Amino acid sequence: MLRGRSLSVTSLGGLPAWEAERLPVEDLLLFEVSWEVTNKVGGICTVIQSKAKTTANEWGENYFLIGPYFEHNVKTQVEPCEPANDAVRKAVDAMNKHGCQVHFGRWLIEGSPYVVLFDISSSVWNLDRWKGDFWEACGVGIPHDDREANDMLIFGSLTAWFLKEVTDHADGKHVIAQFHEWQAGTGLILSRARKLPIATIFTTHATLLGRYLCAANIDFYNQLDKFNIDKEAGERQIYHRYCMERASVHCAHVFTTVSEITAIEADHMLKRKPDVVTPNGLNVKKFSAVHEFQNLHATYKARIQDFVRGHFYGHLDFDLEKTLFLFIAGRYEFSNKGADIFLESLSRLNFLLRMHKSNVTVVVFFIMPAKTNNFNVETLKGQAVRKQLWDTVHCMKEKFGKKLYDGLLRGEIPDMNSILDRDDLTIMKRAIFSTQRHSLPPVTTHNMIDDSTDPILSTIRRIGLFNNRTDRVKVILHPEFLSSTSPLLPMDYEEFVRGCHLGVFPSYYEPWGYTPAECTVMGIPSVTTNLSGFGCFMQEHVADPTAYGIYIVDRRFRSPDDSCNQLTQFLYGFCKQSRRQRIIQRNRTERLSDLLDWRYLGRYYQHARHLTLSRAFPDKFHLEPTSPPTTDGFKYPRPSSVPPSPSGSQTSSPQSSDVENEGDEDERYDEEEEAERDRLNIKSPFSLNHIPKGKKKLHGEYKN
């Protein structure tokens, strides 16, 4: 029986030590297989890329990623090199000799993990034979007209072939292979059918059928136990893909999902309860100075304010210092991403702010890529007018400053009328004239191709948010991903997020949700739901998420209208906060980032690997069926200082204020003291062998 050394897994201040039996990684090889290795398609690439550094630090030269070869990606992301591992080198050479093009190198990301990349196009001639092998292995046929499924079969067949070559030359080393999503699942199915001596893990980040059903506006979560799965998959012509996914799940030694809500979904859709929930993390970079992220917020907020000045020229009758910037970002899935409920709540928020005569203005950005043909002319003109006005003012400032300087040298206080001559007044009048506008500021920065049928624009027309002067809520649709080279809003996504006040992501279908997690790590409050993995994670392990800047909308047990009202109240409460309260809240939000660090959450992947070894090689590896660290009944406590919103304070004014309250509540707040208390209060969020609530642990769970 192989036994490793005891390892204390805690590299973060305040997080509890986790005494785990360390795997003998020097005697193991770890492979992670995904279609998104060096090939960004969606969020799985973010998972693998962000986790690579932590995993590479743990496994060293025995960690490899397997993915597809695309020349345009490899040229900029991969540094070719020769495999140092003897078994991997022999496997690559053997496959190349048989006509397969296998590329090896280091992925140029943090951790620099090794990558093995298969050129799918070089092996297309094997497709018919491999289809026959796959049919014999699991009885699933793949249509000729499904190009994606055919590519996945080639990729999986090459993966199984490669793993066979590796195990033939492994010299006693045990192999772990983790497969992400159904695209990589064919390799798992074929490996198990051929009885390769490898320990397998299958991870689903979202079920295939779940995405299709939610996109069709079906009451998904309340109907989970009522769906005829085979019928639903057949009607959508994805039955063969569903069978590939389900076979992968049932062939794996260990099945994992990224969140508890996805675990419940997978139990119904794929008919197997996940063995381990492995939450997604991020690489958290701490600043040396405590307030540095607050300074970055001020810097990038000023750049967003510059854009707003140009976009709303001629209608800039609101105070930018009392303006809040909200945003929603992600794929253009109108219902799944919650853009529908967000727009409706903005209409209600606009009514509340106007009714209470609030002097707070809310500018909302929709960063969702859609089909466009060019920039909006009015938007470009606005930025040009702003820049021209800025240059004019700078010229006048230099002239004004020289006259003031000369007057003070003479010991005189200059007469303002003598400082500004007729030419200056003419220039100022021309500048004012150039800012006149006879149309409303546009609600979109680009010309939309499907303007009349676009869901966001159609909803804006229905609710009447046209950026009128009387509207306290202004809307801007930016149908492109952000870029620092853009002539309109020259900012990267991270810079833009840091400059905003609140991210709003009221998703209906979100297996994890990286966008609110990224906000948390950057110290920006966010809105999420109890149907997202991130929302469930925070709701379960933080006593008062709102106090820490995590607003969780109930979209599972409330009607759509009630959920919309709840979101509206969250937004209205946020608008009522003073500047000091927002600063305090951002400090608390940033402190939650430790919970999302891969150095902390990576332990659940470690447990999954240990579990699969104990099931695949029970005579060599054993996992003690003892309860890992758990926090039953514990939650990250509510802060004891000033409340995050005025609901419990002395004033009930809906207006934001720059004047700080001097009451006892404010005096009780000591940032360093509270930060230290928070660090000591962070606990392990859930049991390593986590089983979804309401599900009993299967007998012999730790046995093969």
Swiss-Prot record:
Assembly and partners are described as: Part of the glycogen synthase (GS)-glycogenin complex, a heterooctamer composed of a tetramer of GS and 2 dimers of glycogenin, where each GS protomer binds to one glycogenin subunit (via glycogenin C-terminus); the GS tetramer may dissociate from glycogenin dimers to continue glycogen polymerization on its own. May also form a heterooctamer complex with GYG1 (via GYG1 C-terminus).
Q: Which key words tag this protein in UniProt?
A: Allosteric enzyme, Glycogen biosynthesis, Glycosyltransferase, Phosphoprotein, Transferase
Pfam families, alphabetized: Glycogen_syn
Q: Which domain of life is it from?
A: Eukaryota
Q: Which residues form the signal peptide?
A: none
Query: PANTHER family, alphabetically?
Result: GLYCOGEN [STARCH] SYNTHASE, LIVER, GLYCOGEN SYNTHASE
Record: residues binding UDP-alpha-D-glucose:
205, 211, 331, 510, 512-513
Q: Where is the composition biased (Low complexity)?
A: 647-657
Residues bearing Phosphoserine? 8, 11, 627, 641, 645, 649, 653, 657, 684
pH dependence, record text: Optimum pH is 7.5-8.5 (at 25 degrees Celsius) (non-phosphorylated state). Optimum pH is 8.5 (at 25 degrees Celsius) (most phosphorylated state).
List where Acidic residues composition bias occurs: 659-675
Modifications made to the protein after synthesis: Primed phosphorylation at Ser-657 (site 5) by CSNK2A1 and CSNK2A2 is required for inhibitory phosphorylation at Ser-641 (site 3a), Ser-645 (site 3b), Ser-649 (site 3c) and Ser-653 (site 4) by GSK3A an GSK3B. Dephosphorylation at Ser-641 and Ser-645 by PP1 activates the enzyme. Phosphorylation at Ser-8 is not required for interaction with GYG1. Interaction with GYG1 does not regulate the phosphorylation at Ser-8 and Ser-641.
Keyword Transferase on entry: yes
| Entry GO CC | cell cortex; cortical actin cytoskeleton; cytoplasm; cytoskeleton; cytosol
Catalytic activity, reaction form: [(1->4)-alpha-D-glucosyl](n) + UDP-alpha-D-glucose = [(1->4)-alpha-D-glucosyl](n+1) + UDP + H(+)
Q: Where does alpha-D-glucose 6-phosphate bind?
A: 291-292, 294, 297, 301, 501, 582, 586
> Which BP terms does GO give this entry?
glycogen biosynthetic process; glycogen metabolic process; response to glucose
Could you say how this protein's activity is regulated?
Answer: Allosteric activation by glucose-6-phosphate. Phosphorylation reduces the activity towards UDP-glucose. When in the non-phosphorylated state, glycogen synthase does not require glucose-6-phosphate as an allosteric activator; when phosphorylated it does.
User: What is the annotated role of this protein in its UniProt record?
Assistant: Glycogen synthase participates in the glycogen biosynthetic process along with glycogenin and glycogen branching enzyme. Extends the primer composed of a few glucose units formed by glycogenin by adding new glucose units to it. In this context, glycogen synthase transfers the glycosyl residue from UDP-Glc to the non-reducing end of alpha-1,4-glucan.
State its Enzyme Commission number(s). Answer: 2.4.1.11
Name the chain's protein. Glycogen [starch] synthase, liver
Tissues showing expression? Specifically expressed in liver (at protein level).
